[in-house]
Curated annotation (Swiss-Prot):
Principal localisation: membrane
Binding site for ATP: D287, M288, E289, G290, T291, F292, G293, E294, V295, K327
Limits of the Protein kinase domain: 281-583
Glycosylation positions in this chain: N30, N46
Disulfide bonds: C113-C147
SMART domains noted in UniProt: WIF
Protein's recorded name: Inactive tyrosine-protein kinase RYK
GO molecular function, one term: protein kinase activity
Compartments, record wording: Cell membrane; Basolateral cell membrane
Extracellular side: 19-173
Length: 583
C-alpha cells in the first residue's frame, strides 16, 4: 500500500515538474536559411515571443523543415496544420496526438506545392501541450512557403497516404530508374572516397619545412617575393633572427606610412542614410553578450512589391528575407558608450565595398533618426552575414574540436587562404587612408561561401565589452589591446598603417594557432619591454616557415622596416600558389 502511494506521489510530482522544449537546430537553420543559429520556440515551458512571431521562410528549393523537441516529465500534445491556400499542402510527419518524447528527437513538416501557381503562401502549425493540472500550453508557429512556377509539379495526388499505381509498366520503369540512380550514386561515392584519400595523403605529405626544391625556387625569385625565404631555427626568435628575416629594409623603406586620423563622419547623416524600420527585423537568440552590449543574428524582412501569391495579409508584403549579424547596446549603456559604439561601427562607412570587408548594411530603430524625440531604443547595427559569426569564437571551437558546436578540421591551405583574404581587406582600407587600430580575430567574421571559407574584416564596435580579457589599461583609463599593438603605439600612441601591419601579423598568428592568446605568459605591463628585448610570438605548430617569416617581418621594431599591407598580400598570394602545388 505504501509503495502504491509513493508511486502515485512520484507520478504527481513528475506531472507538476513537466515541461517541454521545442526549437529549430543550428544545423537545420543553416540548411534552410543559411544562418548557423538556434531558433528556440519553447524553452522549459516558456514560449519565446520573439520566435513565435517570426514567419519562417521556406524557400522554393526546400521541401521540409525539421523541428527538435523533448519533454521533462509526461507531456501530451495535439497538433494540426493549416494552409491559407490550397496551392500548398503541409504534412506533419508525426501522429496528430501523442506524448512528447523525453529525449531530443526530430520531427518534420513537409510542404508540397500543388498546381502551377507561384508565390508565397502562409502555413500555420498549432500545438497544444497538456501536463498535470496546468493550463494547456498553446503555441502557433508560422511559416511562409515559397512556390516557384514550373510545369509538371507534383499535384495533390503525388503518392501520399495510400495512393496506388496500377500500371505495371510504370512500376518496372520506376524500378529500373531507381537501380540506375543507385548504381550511379555508388560510383560517385567510390570516386569521391578515392579522391578524398589521395588528397588527404597529399596534404599529410606537406612538411613543416617545405622541400629544398621549393626553398630554392623561392630564392630564385627573391625580388618578386622578399618575405618567403625559409630560415631554419631552434627555439624562439631572437633580435638577430628578426633583423635577418627576408623583408629587407630596401623592400620596405619605400613604403608610405599612413598616419591615423579621425574620419570625422557625420553620424546623424550616416544614420539617416542607413535607417531601416526595426519592425522589419526578427531577432534570433543571443550569440554573444557583454556587460553593455550584445550580438545576435536577425532576419531582415525587406519589402518587395512584386508578389505573385494571392495572400492579402499585410505581413505578406514582405517578400525578401536576409540573414544579418547585429550589434546593439543594452539598456544600462550610457550616452558616452553609445557615441563610442556608433563611431566604431561607422569606421568603414561610405568606402568602396570589398568582399573581405564587413560594412554596416543598415541601422534600425523603432523611432526615426530624423525625429530624435521618437527614438527610445538603442540602434540595431546590422551587417550582411550568413555564416559562423565571430572568427575568434570559431577558431576556438575548431581548436577544441567540439563538433556539436560546428568545429571543423582546418588545413594549412585554408588558413593561408584566410590570412590572404584578411590581409587583402587591410590593404583595401589603407588604400583609402583608413587605419583600423584594432586588427584581430575578434574583429572578423567568417562564413562558408560556395564551399570555401571566407573571412571579413569588421570594425571594433563592442569588442572591448565582448572580449574584456584582450584589453588592458596602463593607468591612462583607456583599455587597449596591448598584446596586438606595435611598440610605438604602446609607448607613444602612434597609430598608423605600419602599426596595423604589426597587428595583422598577430592576427596571422591567431589563425595558425586556432585562436590562441598572444603573449599569454607575459603581463600586459611587460609587453613593451619584452618586445624591445626581442621577444616575439613563437611559431605555431604546423605553421610553414615561410608564413612565420611574414609574421616576423610584420613585427620589426622600426615601423619603416615593416612591409606594407599590400606587400604582405602579394607575399601571401605567392606562397599560396606555391603551397597549392602540394595539395
Amino acid at each position: 500500500m505504501i509503495l502504491r502511494y509513493l508511486i502515485f506521489f512520484a507520478q504527481l510530482w513528475a506531472l507538476c515538474l513537466a515541461n517541454v522544449n521545442m526549437f529549430i537546430s543550428k544545423e537545420e537553420m543553416n540548411r534552410t536559411f543559411g544562418v548557423k543559429a538556434e531558433l528556440n520556440y519553447i524553452e522549459m515551458g516558456n514560449v519565446s515571443s520573439y520566435s513565435t512571431k517570426f514567419h519562417y521562410r521556406v524557400m522554393a528549393n526546400i521541401d521540409y523543415l525539421s523541428f527538435t523537441w523533448n519533454a521533462v516529465g509526461i507531456v501530451h500534445y495535439e497538433v494540426y496544420v493549416e494552409s491559407d491556400d490550397s496551392s500548398v499542402l503541409p504534412i506533419v510527419r508525426i501522429p496528430l496526438k501523442g506524448t512528447v518524447p523525453e529525449s531530443l528527437q526530430d520531427f518534420t513538416v513537409e510542404y508540397r506545392c500543388a498546381g502551377h501557381r507561384s508565390g508565397q503562401f502562409a502555413v500555420s502549425l498549432y500545438f497544444t501541450f497538456k501536463y498535470g493540472n496546468k493550463e494547456p500550453l498553446k503555441v502557433k508557429l508560422r511559416q511562409e512557403k515559397i512556390c516557384a512556377s514550373r510545369d509538371g509539379r507534383r499535384g495533390l495526388n503525388g503518392g501520399y497516404e495510400g495512393h496506388e499505381v496500377d500500371d505495371t509498366d510504370s512500376i518496372d520503369k520506376a524500378f529500373f530508374v531507381i537501380i540506375c540512380i543507385a548504381a550511379a550514386f555508388l560510383l560517385i561515392v567510390a570516386a569521391t572516397l578515392i579522391c578524398y584519400f589521395k588528397r588527404s595523403k597529399k596534404e599529410d605529405m606537406i612538411p613543416t619545412r617545405l622541400p629544398t626544391s621549393f626553398r630554392n625556387s623561392l630564392k630564385s625569385t627573391k625580388s618578386a617575393q622578399p618575405f618567403l625565404l625559409s630560415t631554419p631555427r631552434d627555439g624562439p626568435p631572437t633580435l638577430s633572427a628578426i633583423s635577418s628575416a627576408p623583408c629587407s629594409s630596401s623592400s620596405a623603406s619605400g613604403n608610405s606610412i599612413i598616419p591615423s586620423k579621425p574620419r570625422n563622419i557625420d553620424v546623424r547623416r550616416a544614420l539617416l542614410q542607413l535607417y531601416q524600420d526595426r519592425d522589419a527585423f526578427q531577432s534570433l537568440p543571443l550569440d554573444m553578450e557583454g556587460t553593455f552590449g550584445e550580438v545576435r543574428y536577425a532576419i531582415w524582412r525587406q519589402v518587395d512589391d512584386v508578389l505573385n501569391g494571392d495572400v492579402d495579409d499585410e505581413e505578406d508584403t514582405f517578400c525578401n528575407q536576409e540573414a544579418v549579424y547585429t550589434k546593439t547596446l543594452k539598456n544600462n549603456a550610457s550616452p558616452i558608450q553609445l557615441d563610442r559604439f556608433l563611431s566604431d561601427a561607422l569606421l568603414f562607412y561610405n568606402i568602396t565595398p570589398h568582399q573581405n570587408l564587413s560594412q554596416v548594411a543598415c541601422v534600425a530603430s523603432f523611432g526615426r533618426f530624423d525625429r530624435p524625440e521618437t527614438v527610445t531604443d538603442f540602434p540595431l547595427v546590422c551587417y550582411r552575414h550568413q555564416g559562423f559569426g565571430n572568427l575568434k569564437k570559431f577558431l576556438t571551437i575548431c581548436r577544441h574540436g567540439d563538433k556539436t558546436k560546428g568545429a571543423q578540421t582546418l588545413r594549412t591551405h585554408q588558413l593561408v587562404s584566410l590570412a590572404t583574404q584578411v590581409s587583402s581587406a587591410v590593404a583595401h582600407i589603407h588604400k583609402y587612408r583608413i587605419v583600423h587600430n584594432d586588427i584581430a580575430a575578434r574583429n572578423c567574421l567568417i562564413a562558408e561561401v560556395n564551399g570555401r571559407l571566407q573571412v571579413q574584416l569588421c570594425d571594433s564596435a563592442l569588442s572591448r565589452d565582448l572580449f574584456p580579457a584582450d584589453y588592458h589599461c596602463l593607468g591612462d583609463n583607456e583599455n587597449r589591446p596591448l598584446k596586438w599593438m606595435s611598440p610605438e603605439a604602446i609607448a607613444n600612441e602612434l597609430y598608423s598603417s605600419a602599426a596595423d601591419v604589426w597587428s595583422l601579423g598577430v592576427l596571422l598568428w591567431e589563425l595558425m594557432s586556432l585562436g590562441g592568446s598572444p603573449h599569454a605568459e607575459i603581463d600586459p605591463e611587460e609587453v613593451y619591454t619584452m618586445i624591445l628585448k626581442g621577444k616575439r610570438l613563437q611559431q605555431p605548430n604546423n605553421c610553414p616557415d615561410q608564413l612565420y617569416e611574414v609574421m616576423l617581418c610584420c613585427w620589426r621594431v622600426l615601423s619603416e622596416d615593416r612591409p606594407s599591407s599590400e606587400q604582405v598580400v602579394h607575399g601571401l598570394r605567392d606562397f599560396n600558389i606555391q603551397l597549392s602545388q602540394y595539395i
